């Protein structure tokens, strides 16, 4: 009698759990715009969500610790004249976020560590180059201030956000609307999917298609694709019978998928969130109430189903926390921020362990906030892997880094030359922009206090009159 061999994996028992009710973010009017993006972006400091707003597009930015009910007058980030379609935090500065809009522009914003008293309306820079709506944003994983945008004009533009210049424009590769764009780990290649049902690998600096596969999935619904850590590709799509699929591809041989998993029948496009440290891909569909996750390995069958986290409410969007924002003391290997119609709910993925010690096997060194290259170095042909950090002592986000406006680079946040001596907050020079912003905030607070004092005085007088009248 043969014995069934159980596959050995430290991720066989990954469990998902929704955070407690008091850890959710309540009373948020999540955007109802029809667009297949995540509508949510998160980093170790902030949570950003695209919201409903009159008179243009807007998104809300909350400190992670600001859970509970969000005041209806909480300041928004506004400035777009059309709906916001995508947002993405800069991986090298936790206070910088980019937004893309139906109004054809991309805006880059500096988010202060303190809570502003009014809407943030002035971006650091507005990037204008698309002729139709912009629905996709993606920062370069290793080069400072390099941002990619893709629009309804079938064009991909790669910007140097620090100078506002167009580094590259890929305008003759895609014959139809682009559905997704993803960098590989060192930012040397792009993987794109398009309405023409073709999966492409592109060298952006040569404006060349390195490899392509027509109809990787036979269905008519949109595709998505992401690179794996070893350079393979994961794609999500639909079969001819509308079954949702996950496929693994070797770019050196696009004839047949290395592995193919078929799932349920549904209309929701599956958004893949890939973690290179664990080689787990999480699949989240808009309108679904579940998250499926699979482990990708180098031995057959290559794609291994792990589990499904299910809940009652369908998701309107999803945010995925970078590894450096996780709680390693709780063996947390992933954290999602699930958007409901009126709230955002954290979902935590853990690997149960008996020991309280740091689990080295769960937490290899992971990309940190330091860029490996400058924009001009990358453009000249240099490549570099991400600068890694250890999570053993628990990641602590760096203090707020102010954008210094210079002719060369408006997002120049290069750290001091000597890392051994840190400059205290009292020694750090304030830019003119920061000083003016703080003075405006102080004036607004004074005006508010004065108005409240006048209101209190008026109410006290009314109370005295009422008391006198009853005597």
Curated annotation (Swiss-Prot):
Gene3D superfamilies assigned: YVTN repeat-like/Quinoprotein amine dehydrogenase
Record keywords, A-Z: Coiled coil, Repeat, WD repeat
Ranges in a coiled coil: 426-468
InterPro entries according to UniProt: Coronin, DUF1899, WD40/YVTN_repeat-like_dom_sf, WD40_repeat_CS, WD40_repeat_dom_sf, WD40_rpt
Biased composition (Low complexity): 419-429
PROSITE patterns recorded: WD_REPEATS_1, WD_REPEATS_2, WD_REPEATS_REGION
WD repeat locations: 79-119, 129-169, 173-212, 216-259, 264-304
Residue ranges, annotated region (Disordered): 410-433
SUPFAM superfamilies linked to this entry: WD40 repeat-like
Annotated protein name in UniProt: Coronin-6
Naturally occurring in which organism (per UniProt): Mus musculus (Mouse)
Gene assigned in the entry: Coro6
């Amino acid at each position: 009698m043969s014995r069934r061999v159980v596959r050995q994996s430290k991720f066989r028992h990954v469990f998902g759990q929704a955070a407690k009710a008091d850890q959710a973010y309540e009373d948020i009017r999540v955007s109802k715009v029809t667009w297949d993006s995540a509508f949510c972006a998160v980093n170790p400091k902030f949570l950003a969500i695209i919201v409903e707003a009159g008179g243009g597009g807007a998104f809300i930015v909350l400190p992670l610790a600001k859970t509970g009910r969000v005041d209806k007058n909480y300041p928004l980030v506004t400035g777009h004249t059309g709906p916001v379609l995508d947002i993405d935090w800069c991986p090298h500065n936790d206070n910088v976020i980019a937004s893309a809009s139906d109004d054809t522009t991309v805006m880059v914003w500096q988010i202060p560590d303190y809570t502003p008293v009014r809407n943030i309306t002035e971006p650091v820079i507005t990037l204008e180059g698309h002729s139709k709506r912009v629905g996709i944003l993606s920062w370069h994983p290793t080069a400072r201030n390099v941002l990619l945008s893709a629009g309804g004009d079938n064009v991909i533009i790669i910007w140097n956000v620090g100078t506002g210049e167009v580094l590259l424009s890929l305008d003759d590769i895609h014959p139809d609307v682009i559905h997704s764009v993803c960098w590989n780990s060192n930012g040397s290649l792009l993987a794109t999917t398009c309405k023409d049902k073709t999966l492409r690998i592109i060298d952006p600096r040569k404006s060349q298609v390195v490899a392509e596969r027509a109809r990787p999935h036979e269905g008519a619904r949109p595709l998505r694709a992401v690179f794996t850590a070893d350079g393979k590709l994961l794609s999500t799509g639909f079969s001819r019978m509308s079954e949702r699929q996950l496929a693994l591809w070797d770019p050196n041989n696009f004839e047949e998928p290395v592995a193919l998993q078929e799932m349920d029948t549904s209309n929701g496009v599956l958004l893949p969130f890939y973690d290179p440290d664990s080689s787990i891909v999480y699949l989240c569909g808009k309108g679904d109430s579940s998250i499926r996750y699979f482990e990708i390995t180098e031995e057959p069958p290559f794609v291994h189903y792990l589990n499904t986290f299910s809940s009652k409410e369908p998701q309107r969007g999803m945010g995925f926390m970078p590894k450096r924002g996780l709680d390693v003391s709780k063996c947390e290997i992933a954290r999602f921020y699930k958007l409901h119609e009126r709230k955002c709910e954290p979902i935590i993925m853990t690997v149960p362990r008996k020991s309280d010690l740091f689990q080295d096997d769960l937490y290899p060194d992971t990309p940190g906030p330091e860029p490996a290259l400058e924009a001009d170095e990358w453009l000249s042909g240099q490549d570099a892997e991400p600068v890694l950090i250890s999570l053993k002592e628990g990641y602590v986000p760096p203090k707020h880094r102010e954008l210094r406006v210079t002719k060369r680079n408006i997002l120049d946040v290069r750290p001091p030359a000597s890392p051994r001596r840190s400059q205290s907050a009292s020694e750090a020079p304030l830019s003119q922009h920061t000083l003016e912003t703080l003075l405006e905030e102080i004036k607004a607070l004074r005006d508010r206090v004065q108005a409240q004092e006048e209101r209190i005085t008026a109410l006290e007088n009314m109370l005295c009159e009422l008391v006198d009248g009853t005597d």
